[in-house]
Amino acid sequence: MARKVLFLLSIFSFLSFSSVFADEPSAKEGDGFIENLDKSIEEKFEPISTKIQDIVFYAIPVSTDADGNPVKVPWVLGWLGIAAIVFTVYFKFVNFRSWKLAFQTVKGKYSSSTDPGEITHFQALTAALSGTVGLGNIAGVAVAVGIGGPGATFWMILMGLFGMASKFCECTLGVKYRQIENGKVYGGPMQYLTRGLGEMGLGSLGTMLAFLFAILCIGGSFGGGNMYQANQACSQLIEVTGGEVSFFSSNRWVFGLIMGLAVGLVIIGGIKSIAQVTAALVPFMCGIYMLAAFIVIFSNFGEVGNAFGLIFQGAFAPTAVGGGIVGVLIQGIKRAAFSNEAGIGSAPIAHSAVKTKFAASEGIVALLEPFIDTVIVCTTTALVIVMAGTYDDDTFCFCFF
């Protein structure tokens, strides 16, 4: 199966890039090779991405704003939100009553060096967090507050708390249905969709869904997981090295190449190498960011109470920005989903490599992710933004992109 998938992806990549280079001769004279390549790739993939976006983010009208315009909810957000609530109730609020056990498990209290797997609970947690703590906590929160007002923060926190149950479920399944061959762990939605649904007599459906997930996961990792991050990092580098006159302004590909090589050095060693790097990098990264945020907050400590007041008031105010309460709620759920990836299926791939005999133990550890990512980091970001008081500026959201 893996060879067939690899073969299909290879053919797809070959045809895509062949068509890209086939268009090169028609480029305008004087244009650079990289510029032409960028334009060609965009022209080839934009129709595909647009169609996928129209399907995935198909919006259902649920209300109207003050001007009578419909307020729409993307069906995928409703699916994620309802699933998170159902899991919370079904597992008797595991996301609220298992914190102590989660921290004990992360510290290795119930671990043994002989347990099957490749990485520790802490390494698995940081490996998964490395993919969620980032621009979603900064620009994502800024967009939520800029569009939905301070009240979006409340719904973002609430979605983060319920999302802990979704993370618990998917990561437990990732360990339960993983396969270990010659010391190497293979896990994630590809495994539990195939094997789990197979046990229910739905093997064909499971195989099809696993195949689709693998393809879409690769696409998502290229876009939101890599291109978005690299683009924003490059933009910041250009800004601090001279702006338009910076070397990287006209040679962005150089930055991309450097970043690609740096990432390649890490991932070429597999999950063990990735986990070792993230175990050292993620705590430092989060610590530096939180320290900077706390300096801002404590420097303006007198505004903290007012900021929380605006958050709670905006969450339930009928005249809230962007379509009333429903509009604010949508913004909060959107940014929480983008930030913590609860229910997306990416985290189980990292968590399935953990050393443990009990699948649910890693699910307990995984539920800490949305709490750290959304409830702590995103809330801190929102406080800084609300205290600054610039979120209602018309140009506020655009300064992040």
Which ranges hold each PLM region?
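Membrane-interface loop-to-helix entry segments
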Residues: 3, 79-82, 87-103, 213, ...
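N-terminal alpha-helical transmembrane segments of multi-pass membrane transport
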Residues: 5-8, 14-135, 145-150, 163
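Extracellular/periplasmic helix-exit of transmembrane alpha-helices
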Residues: 23, 168-178, 182, 292-310, ...
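Helix-loop-helix module between adjacent transmembrane segments
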Residues: 87-88, 129-130, 159-185, 194-229, ...
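Flexible loop linkers connecting adjacent transmembrane helices
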Residues: 93-121, 143-153, 165-203, 391-401
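Alpha-helical membrane segments and immediately flanking helix-loop junctions
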Residues: 114-147, 173-176, 182-196, 212-218, ...
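Selective recognition of specific alpha-helical transmembrane segments in multi-pass small-molecule
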Residues: 162-170, 256-271, 282-302, 335, ...
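Membrane-embedded translocation segments of transport machinery
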Residues: 268-279, 284-357, 369-370
